[in-house]
């Protein structure tokens, strides 16, 4: 250490405090990185790695660097690669310091603490999430530093906590240090993957410390006053976030002024699987917004409105009063196109006030950010005027809650020029007339420059040297330049400063005096402008809570207007939402499928579900007929209604549901080492554990991932359980290829059979996509295979095998006669192992599966003939 230069010793001391971050060490106009940081950063950033001898032992030290004025994209790239970046600035003026300049880390940028606009998706939140597992509860707190959005809740299980993680989709997760090795992150590696996991010392979660952190940050007397007093685990999760901010953000975070505590029971609960299966935020296939419900409904014109819409979709309401408040507002906007378009036009020029407010509070806002804030505020009076006649409760409340922030608008308008430069420390920011001393200095600067022009003309006249020039450069300042051929004509008061090849440069006492005056004024102008800008920014930051409230109201208004615009264009209707137990939809349509296929008429369908005769609807029919689309559309219509949106239907009445479960599709979970069938069974188990009579359950092809008999058995048992178990007798749509399940309608009084209508013509099948009562008579699998393009030879052979199976023709050993031949010495095929201990042969299984009470005499004779041929 003693052999290192003072600068490198300083670097290593600071680096020791931030071992897990890449240290951006400010040296003049560059951020330098050294040693391992340099090696890692040069690889990620694809910049040159060099070396320099910084010590007395002759060892080279790896280094790389980036310009400080364009560091943002480099920082963003490192953070995107999962790195933390510690920004170390010079906190003293190098000109006024002898020796080493004092440096400090002013902030640490992590994936969950990004505030730079260019690094953030405008309509996506960037959350830092904190998990704290208690003995019987989990605390979940999450913060978007860029907007100040801070929320906390508690769950009663680890699964529910991780479901919140999936919904929030944070960039970074905080957990207690004790969980670093095989702890909470290892419980759900699929959800932890792709996110930075950061660990916090155990003492931070101490109850007294947590309480003190919350009280001090929010300036309240107790945690109860902050909104999370009844959430012990939630309080500790919040404290971890606040502690992490203290460690990483040295500036003020006053825009984080409100903590929203909520109970998951306040919203319609959607687990991770259901959110994915319904494609709420992104499609299953490519993960894009287009093709998702969010992609369809998002006609918001502001970034903050887009973020709020996503929150509404992922957290639908269960309060009938709040749902109908939203529906009233949407209805008013749908009914008056001029009103709706006027509101949307007024909002269209509003910038992202939430993120502007965040940058202002964190002292990272530019002058252009302040101008953008003012440009947004000047639109508010006309917007409020538009809202004056609003009759719905919610629109009126939003109108009355919008703060014009006239004082903020006036301050920025008076203090900042309309088109300021990007760079803050080069002047040109503060408006003329805002500050008298600045105006005087500018006058001196302008007059001084005019004096130089007059001096040049004066000296040309005095010396008779027409080529004489008065110029300036940063090395010599102002000077008079005379060519060597004219040196004999210079006056005696010229003082030589520099000799060139063809000319010489001089100064005069008068020129030197004005140089000091002019240059002193320009330096003072830049210094004073920056100080005045900081003062304006701080005064605006002091109004951060007012700005945040207005931003929230504008975002809500934007969402309502967007939902109204979609409803108008797509002929959606207002649903009736009440406390009843029925879901009745007439002429329902899948919102996304309909929108993406405008050239083809969507076949609308009706549905009735309730806790009476229509509790469990068994839907049979071939693949591609539309079963999955129908079931998803029912779930989406319910979700849209409880979001406060109009719905794609001719008429809809929705009894509020508490949860929506979907078990649709098949996929392995390789990260958790689970097969398709295991994923299916785990999701089904979660439904049976958590469903209530208020829930909506959508099940598609339960049991298809195993053998036929096992699959039928599981599907049948699941259906019976949902019907017979009072605790979880949810309204259920149950699609299946197992036609045996249609028998449930005979033995269970709340089961109803439906199928997807199909028309056969010339050995072809036409899917009518209409849901009709009754069970399907055929599966049409071979016809679907033909439509998919299988070779005709395969189709014909499939028909032959199907015929043998249906006629019960069996070969030796009870195996269906499907093989055309058997090679000599071939081993006898082994049947697929069952999940259950089955000792019965095929004959016994067939007999055991008969419902004798439901057979007609003719059906009984036919089955007896079939059994005789099997013996």
UniProtKB/Swiss-Prot annotation:
Pfam families: MutS_I (PF01624), MutS_II (PF05188), MutS_III (PF05192), MutS_IV (PF05190), MutS_V (PF00488)
A GO-annotated cellular component: cytosol
GO molecular function: ATP binding; ATP-dependent DNA damage sensor activity; damaged DNA binding; mismatched DNA binding
Binding site for ATP: 621-628
UniProt record, GO biological process: mismatch repair
InterPro entries recorded: DNA_mismatch_repair_MutS, DNA_mismatch_repair_MutS-lik_N, DNA_mismatch_repair_MutS/MSH, DNA_mismatch_repair_MutS_C, DNA_mismatch_repair_MutS_clamp, DNA_mismatch_repair_MutS_core, DNA_mismatch_repair_MutS_N, DNA_mismatch_repair_MutS_sf
CDD domains reported for this sequence: ABC_MutS1
Family of the protein in this entry: Belongs to the DNA mismatch repair MutS family.
Function: This protein is involved in the repair of mismatches in DNA. It is possible that it carries out the mismatch recognition step. This protein has a weak ATPase activity.
Record's protein name: DNA mismatch repair protein MutS
Organism: Geobacter sulfurreducens (strain ATCC 51573 / DSM 12127 / PCA)
Native organism taxonomy: Bacteria, Pseudomonadati, Thermodesulfobacteriota, Desulfuromonadia, Geobacterales
Gene name of the record: mutS
